[in-house]
Amino acid sequence: MELKDPELFTLKDRAAEMNLNVPILVEGKHDVDALREIGFRGHLIKINRGVSLDLFAEMIARNFRKIILLTDFDRKGQSIKTRLQVLLSSYGCEINLEFWDFINRNYKIKSVEDIPWLMEKVLSEATNSNGKRH
């Protein structure tokens, strides 16, 4: 089976491996559930916790020197991502956006919740292109 886009899986695996030591910031509970579904086992932190982004960023930077940022891909998610990048960077926090950037550049999904579906779709297309059915 040849994947149309093996880089999606490579980057997912790399992010999941990093997540064993580096927390991932996501917008909400459904995003946490989606990442758990595709094998993320590390610390996943919900952004929407009833505090301002300024206070949230300060709390994160106090506790972590590196983070992976994985907000939704819609306008609101992009706005949150941009704001947190500015805030966290100002506190000296290193931000990894590799997985987010790749998905946003190559796929038309709107939320982190869609990532398991996207990965299944890419796998399914690879299987179907080889004449196999599942």
Predicted features and spans:
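Short alpha-helix boundary/capping motifs
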Residues: I24-L25, Q78
